[in-house]
């Protein structure tokens, strides 16, 4: 559970530390706004994707399923600034599938907390393998990191791409190629 009072106190201290007047008209409600925003953007802390991936439907097909271009927003755990982009999830069912919105909810669970893109990619894949008992999973995450855009090297538009493979995707290069082709369609 997020402690909004601590966040408000901390935000006031930060504003004072950078030389701002916390009682100024434009800032007086900022600590409260930040606390409410953090409650939303860090709502994945302590959550598990199991509740979203546990309701499945029987299928008589083991054909590839791809949900692509799932938009995500997260916060870099190193600088607490946003990174955002698209997630592409491909999996090979093992007789059961999940509702497509549940894949997006899985992304939300793992992106709504201080995060690393590499870990986000792995957590999504691992949860789908575990809770769907999939024959294989491939996850591709494309992200733009504000820690590279607005500070440091200042390279707007630079994208980080991470991938991970589980099950049949580790063994079959043509499956990977099919997914990359489908993502680019």
From Swiss-Prot:
Protein name, UniProt field: GTP cyclohydrolase 1
GO MF annotation terms: GTP binding; GTP cyclohydrolase I activity; zinc ion binding
NCBIfam families, sorted: folE (TIGR00063), PRK09347.1-2 (NF006825), PRK09347.1-3 (NF006826)
Lineage, highest ranks first: Bacteria, Bacillati, Bacillota, Clostridia, Eubacteriales
Record gene name: folE
E.C. number(s) listed in UniProt: 3.5.4.16
Protein family membership: Belongs to the GTP cyclohydrolase I family.
Annotated GO CC locations: cytoplasm
Any one of the GO BP annotations: tetrahydrofolate biosynthetic process
Subunit structure: Toroid-shaped homodecamer, composed of two pentamers of five dimers.
Residues noted as binding Zn(2+) in the record, renumbered to the chain: 76, 79, 147
Pathway as given in its UniProt record: Cofactor biosynthesis; 7,8-dihydroneopterin triphosphate biosynthesis; 7,8-dihydroneopterin triphosphate from GTP: step 1/1
Superkingdom of origin: Bacteria
Metal-binding is among the record's keywords: yes
Organism: Clostridium perfringens (strain 13 / Type A)
PANTHER family: GTP CYCLOHYDROLASE 1 (PTHR11109:SF7), GTP CYCLOHYDROLASE I (PTHR11109)
Gene3D superfamilies reported for this sequence: 1.10.286.10, 3.30.1130.10
Enzyme type, top EC level: hydrolase
